[in-house]
Amino acid sequence: MALAQQFQLNSITFSLLVFLGFVGVSQLIRIYWRLRYIPGPFWAKFTDVQRVFWVQTQRAHEIHRDAHGKYGDIVRFGPNMVSVADPAWIKTIYPMRPGFPKGEFYRALMPYSRQGGALPAVFTTRDENLHKMLKSPVAPLFSLSNVLTLESHVDATIKVLVEQWDRRFLDSQDSIDLADWLSFFAFDVMGTLTFSKRYGFLEEGKDVGGMINTIFTFLKTAAPMTQVPWFDNIWIKNSFAASFRKSNGSSILQIVGKHTSERLKASKSQDMNGSAMSVTKDRDMLDQFIGLAAKNPDLPPWCVTAWTFSNVAAGSDSTAAVMKKVFHSLLSHPNTLQRLMDELIQAQKTNKNMKETPFPSWRDICDLPYLDACILEGIRLHPPFCLPFERVVPKGGIMIGKTYIPEDTLIGMSPWVINHHKPTFGEDAEDWNPNRWMGPEEEKQKREAAILTFGAGKRICLGKQIAMLELKKIVATLLLTYEFEILDPERYEVENWWFFRQHGIDVRVRRRSDKE
């Protein structure tokens, strides 16, 4: 009797195991079959785990590039994720019209607090209607004409940087980690533009309060989660799980909230009309955000916090990454540095305004062709964000060349892969070569349109004009003010956690006037 019962129990267990095995195998076949005709690494057919491992290596951008080199322009990176390497398809995947919503990838980049939940922003929201609601009021603030009303804030920050270098390094001839100081500059610029108040990184010569490290730690945590966003919902954006750990996104929100609440209190006694078209000179961006929120009562109550968070978290490190690449490349390639110096010195000699002002104005340098070429080459070679910008294929699917991509597939392009596309940028696409931008204007415009650094289509980065203002001004000013000696070009190090972080640009500086 006992033997019969044991046999019956074993039969039930066996049947259950067979059923579960059948379900598991069927699921694997279903996952594999959907995109079976798209080449890619073996494990990408069944799981996203290898995508997490790629991010954890800190060199996912190189792995993605190598995968495209092996499998072609269209590669399966995951069971439901396809990467495209040819810039010719940028307008298809990132159109100006609605229809290609962002994937769950972006939810992992939203800061989270137990009290307020996940905070959407213009960059991270997947909701097309919410994106339009958040973007439309602030878009005029990021136009070049409005950004130039804030140029004096950039000049004030440059002045502090120059004063600190003169005081700290000219007499001692101590080396400078230029990478750190460019980060300090970029953050203090955004602090000044946003709050009319620097964070104090330049004055202190360090990451005051650990703010830069906090943002990087947040991104370091979020980057792997972007590859498995379902796990982010369980482990990060979950109030129960959040109670057992410190949220880095919450720390950044506290910084933003402090500045915002102080300004809101101060603004109650002021007359604010909120018009982006009537911005007065030197009025900072937080003032303008608050004014716009007051003028648009239909906006969500957290909109000022979301706009400000984007400035603080994304508007600094991204620009600093390109600054570092431009300076490292110039200092490592003396011939291109000399050509740029010749152009800047000639402009200074022939431009009365450049002679009479301490720092070059945007008007004085915006059209210098070789400066423009160097900035574009830095933007191309080292985009700050280097994982694919994921989108969801709309109903009916799409054709990429002769390859059909079914609806609901995640599709994306990595800025690193796109910007290093050899058929577009030349066989030397991996190398620093500003001359590629000095050819016919038509060719230059075609290549510029192929750069994905700032995104594309209706979700293109709002802060592009601010970045260009900072880049051209800091490169021109520092090169005209100092002579640089790079100590070890090979010490340059890069970490990729969605945002890049670079170290090891050790230099010595001396005033140009000291030698001349």
From Swiss-Prot:
This is Cytochrome P450 monooxygenase asR2. Pfam families: p450 (PF00067). One of its GO terms (molecular function) is monooxygenase activity. It is found in: Membrane. PANTHER family: CYTOCHROME P450, CYTOCHROME P450 MONOOXYGENASE PKFB. Cytochrome P450 monooxygenase; part of the gene cluster that mediates the biosynthesis of xenovulene A, an unusual meroterpenoid that has potent inhibitory effects on the human gamma-aminobutyrate A (GABAA) benzodiazepine receptor. The first step of xenovulene A biosynthesis is the biosynthesis of 3-methylorcinaldehyde performed by the non-reducing polyketide synthase aspks1. The salicylate hydroxylase asL1 then catalyzes the oxidative dearomatization of 3-methylorcinaldehyde to yield a dearomatized hydroxycyclohexadione. One of its GO terms (biological process) is terpenoid biosynthetic process. Belongs to the cytochrome P450 family. The keyword Metal-binding applies.
